[in-house]
Structures are given as C-alpha cells and as structure tokens.
Design a protein with these regions (language model features):
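Mature catalytic core of soluble alpha/beta enzymes
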Residues: 2-13, 17-227
Length: 227
C-alpha cells in the first residue's frame, strides 16, 4: 500500500512539469544582417512575447559582437577591431571589457588549443587575399607580398596590457582578423547570456556556428545538419 502511495505521489509531482513543457510553443527568428551570413534561432517559450524578448536580446548581443569584431568599418561610439588595426601600431589602444576579454582569450586559449591554427594576428596575410578577391581582376596575391606579410603574424607581437586594458602592435604592418573564431565566440557568449535570462530550450545557428541550449520539451535533443 505504501509503495502504491509513493508511486502515485511521484506521478502527481511529474504532472506540473509535463504540463509546463506542453504549454511551450516552438518559435523562430531569422536575421540577414549579422556577420555577413544567415542567422537562425529557434526555441521554445511560453508565449510569443516571451520569445520576442529573448530574441531581441540575442540580436542585440550578436549585433554588438558583429560591430566589435568588424575589421572593415568604424561605428560611432565603438572602439572595434577596425580602429585597433588603424591605431595600435602607433600607440596602445584602450578597448572595452568585452573586446579585451575576447582578444585575451584568442591569444591565451584559442591559439595554443589549435596549435596556432587560429592565429588572429594573421590579418596582414588575410588582407592580401581579401583585396585580391575584391579586385576587378581577381587573382592570387603576389608571392613576394605574401612572404613579406608572413613576417608580421607572430601573435607575441600582439601586446595586451591587462592593467591598462590596451592593445598594441609591435610592427606597423601587423593586423588582426578574427574570422576563424569570432562568430563562434559571439554565439557562445550570446547563448550563455540567453540562459542567464531564463531561456532553457533553443538552437542557435549563426552561419554554421551552432549552439544548443538545453533540450526540446520532453528531453529530446536538438539536432543540426552539417554540410
């Protein structure tokens, strides 16, 4: 008899959780103006208003990182990588908490973890390829120009001052390009912020940088196609 009562109590305790999960609906949002790619977010929420509040916050976070990591444009009121590349060889450039934390992570964590494959200091070389690609007559960059640029991609020449929160380049030819890690980092930070705001079930796909938050209602895992 006691076992039956215990089993009944467990069933009753599970009912509210199941009911809450069943009340949540699937929503989505798509943006085309972030990181030069398609950004898709889908997830479960109690209402359209709740979902809209979450996606507006996520869009704001992603847009902020998009501006911070942009090496081609300046934005009013923002010190971003465009500004750093333009000024850091002349004098240390003070940057925001977010940008400094990202650059420190790139140098101290991402670079050694990938054995140097994610070198954000390789901007001088990547710029040559970008300019060649955007030219009216696209062609591979000059070999001598590439060789010269390769002498200015040592990440140790990226000087980060924790106390002053500044960025400085040892060589004027040096440039940063965070294309290898920028979107992934932005997606991770955006997902963490969304979780802190209470989002429990979502899938972010920002140009192939995928991050799941929790599971679907009922415990089913999120799935994402890989091309």
């Amino acid at each position: 008899m006691r076992r039956r009562r215990t089993a009944l109590l467990l069933v009753l305790l599970c009912l509210p959780l199941t009911a809450c999960q069943e009340q949540q609906n699937l929503y989505s949002a798509t943006w085309f103006d972030l990181f030069d790619t398609v950004a898709i977010v889908q997830g479960y929420a109690d209402s359209q208003d709740s979902w809209n509040a979450q996606t507006q916050a996520m869009y704001s976070d992603l847009q902020r990182y998009n501006e911070l990591f942009d090496i081609y444009h300046h934005y009013d009121g923002v010190i971003n990588l465009y500004d750093v590349n333009a000024r850091a060889a002349a004098a240390p450039v003070q940057v925001s908490d977010e940008l400094y934390a990202f650059l420190r992570w790139c140098k101290d964590t991402a670079y050694p973890a990938a054995n140097g494959a994610t070198n954000i200091a390789a901007g001088a070389v990547l710029r040559l390829w970008h300019d060649a690609r955007e030219s009216d007559s696209p062609a591979p960059p000059d070999a001598d120009a590439i060789a010269a640029a390769l002498t200015h991609i040592d990440i140790e020449d990226l000087v980060l001052d924790d106390a002053a929160q500044t960025v400085y380049f040892t060589y004027p030819e040096m440039a940063l390009d965070v294309g290898a890690v920028g979107k992934g980092y932005a997606v991770e930070q955006t997902a963490r912020a969304a979780q802190a705001r209470g989002l429990t079930s979502a899938l972010l796909n920002i140009g192939g940088n995928v991050r799941a938050i929790g599971t679907k209602p009922g415990g089913k895992p999120w799935t994402a196609g890989v091309e």
